[in-house]
Amino acid sequence: MTNRERFANILNKKSDHCGFWHGNPNPASQEYLFGSLNVKNDFEFGLKLGSTCRWIMPDEHHVWKHPDGKPYFDPLGGQERHSLSQPGVFAECEDVDEVEKYPWPDPKYCDFTETIAEIDRTIAADQAVLSGMWSCFFHNVCDYFGMENYFIKMYTDPDVVEAVTEHIADFYMQANEALFRQAADRIDMFFFGNDFGSQLDLLISPEAFDRFVMPTFVKFTNLAHKYGMKVLLHSCGSIDRVIPRLIDAGVDALHPIQARARGMDAVHLSQAYGKDLVFVGGVDTQELLPFGTPRQVRDEVRRLRDLFGPNYVVS
């Protein structure tokens, strides 16, 4: 059985053995790991560790090629970021017309040539492919207002929030469709990320989530399913209160399972959602990996494997 076949079995809950993904270590850890294992890049790293799958993020493969070198989103108007609450260009906006006149990015400047080359290289090495634009619309909208302003404007200027969200999502939707038209048959799972939780709870209420997130969110899951792909959502934090909504919206698998966030322990998740979701992750990165012993890490991986069963990707 190839890794792609095994990964497909995991996603379809037909596997007899869990998978493994080495994840996305932070730069300092990555430098150390690459040196220790004598590898040069993420591709070689995954092969060395025997990863079942590989994440190919278009942003890391020169997808955006604006002739003037402009980024596709510039929420701070060229200013350097110093906090998540830093006011963005729409911090004081109260008029949808201002949003409509803003120079939103044109997906025609997306070039997936290098991304597709990496996809082909990954398949040739017998690894399943996770890909798609990161599509972190929730974060992007937040940046265009500043986090506090964003949450306030959901109540004071909801039409402005919805307009900004629509423009950002439209860019990602068109970019993803351009990629999917070229390579959907080679992408095993659409992987995108929006962190909806903090350590203790959701960042916004479930009611606000239903109004300002879900109508956009479901567009991405529907698009991926239209092209025959499963959907893996990355969402850090305590998101237990909206997991049923995410399942209803078409999420097939969930990452990273922030083990120490409230309500995200493996026992609860496996019992509550194990029939509906494939879990990717779950190994505690806040305490266990940085401070635990090798034996403790091994024991925890075995515990997670036993809880989630064979239809699980250790990461």
Protein language model regions, located:
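Residue-level detector of functionally special positions within alpha-helical transmembrane segments
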Residues: 2, 46, 50, 74-83, ...
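Short, solvent-exposed loop/edge-beta patches enriched in aromatic
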Residues: 15, 47-56, 66, 125
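Catalytic domains of carbohydrate-active enzymes, especially glycoside hydrolases
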Residues: 39-59, 182-183
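Secretory-pathway glycan-assembly enzymes, especially type II membrane glycosyltransferases
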Residues: 55-57, 77, 116
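A contiguous, low-structure linker/loop signature
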Residues: 61-111, 125-128
